């Protein structure tokens, strides 16, 4: 549910440059601290200082050890682990961040990198939504999560001909706060692992959906196929955008972001 990290290539010197900045910032003189000297620094001080310098978050870093080339290039060439896959995205990946000041800073940062240059080109593809908040959520969720995840699914199912199933998690819990958050980033995880915390309004409907999802995931692990008696999950085929929607009801559908992803051409 975070395919966005493969979509943009960063300068592989940036992590090294930032590491040097950190070593200099923590130094009491003008010389960068060595790794052994850094190990002597209080971890909390390192963390606070690192948060001022490192802003790449979950971006993949080409370190020439674990990652030797851009992740997207690996997917394009089929240079990845040969496994079947369940992959998906949520309806409101970006919604709860939109009014948050930290989100605004993140957007400004990504804009500087040229990541959102194409957003203005897709206004017509989001005009079916009722308000600006929904449109912004749709555009950013599609760019950062949905479309890159479909790219991964396409490559896994075509380049090495593995079996892939794509889900769209659309279930919104009951309550005012839940309505504000929507089907937020990671909303499916309590259902997959049956970890509904006390603060989450959990209904019988949610408990039923939990059993369905767990049985489906377990069947996938046992047999390589997530289909069980209660669901008919279509196998992913490149560029068709067929998904299983986990919502109040389970249903197969063409993903809402299909036209957007085709226009984005990730």
Regions flagged by a language model, labelled:
Residues 2-23:
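Flexible "cap/lid" loop of the alpha/beta hydrolase fold
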Residues 5, 36-40, 44-205:
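Substrate-gating cap/lid region and adjacent catalytic-acid/histidine neighborhood
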Residues 14, 102-106, 229:
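Glycine-rich, phosphate-binding/catalytic loops in enzymes
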Residues 19, 148, 213-217:
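Alpha-helical packing segments of well-folded alpha/beta enzyme cores
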Residues 25-40:
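Short, charged, surface-exposed loops that flank catalytic or proteolytic processing sites
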Residues 65-66, 131, 155-164, 172-173, ...:
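Alpha/beta-hydrolase-fold serine-hydrolase catalytic core, especially in secreted/extracellular enzymes
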């Amino acid at each position: 549910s975070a395919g966005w990290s493969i979509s943009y290539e960063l300068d592989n010197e940036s992590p090294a440059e930032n590491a040097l900045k950190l070593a200099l910032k923590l130094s009491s003189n003008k010389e960068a601290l060595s790794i052994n000297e850094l190990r002597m620094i209080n971890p909390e001080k390192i963390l606070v200082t690192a948060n001022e310098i490192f802003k790449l978050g979950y971006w993949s870093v080409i370190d020439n050890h674990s990652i030797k080339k851009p992740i997207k290039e690996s997917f394009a060439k089929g240079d990845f682990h040969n496994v079947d896959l369940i992959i998906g995205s949520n309806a409101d990946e970006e919604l709860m961040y939109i009014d948050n000041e930290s989100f605004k800073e993140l957007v400004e940062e990504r804009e500087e990198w040229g990541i959102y240059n194409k957003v203005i080109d897709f206004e017509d593809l989001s005009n079916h939504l009722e308000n600006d908040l929904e449109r912004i959520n749709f555009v950013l969720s599609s760019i950062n999560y949905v479309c890159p995840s479909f790219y991964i699914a396409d490559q896994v199912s075509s380049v090495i001909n593995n079996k892939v199933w794509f889900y769209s998690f659309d279930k919104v819990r009951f309550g005012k706060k839940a309505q504000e958050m929507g089907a937020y980033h990671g909303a499916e995880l309590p259902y997959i692992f049956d970890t509904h915390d006390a603060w989450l309004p959990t209904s019988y409907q949610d408990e039923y959906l939990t059993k369905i999802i767990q049985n489906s995931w377990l069947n996938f692990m046992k047999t390589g196929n997530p289909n069980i008696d209660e669901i008919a999950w279509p196998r992913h085929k490149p560029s068709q955008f067929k998904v299983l929607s986990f919502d109040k009801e389970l249903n197969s559908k063409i993903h809402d972001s299909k036209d957007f992803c085709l226009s984005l051409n990730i």
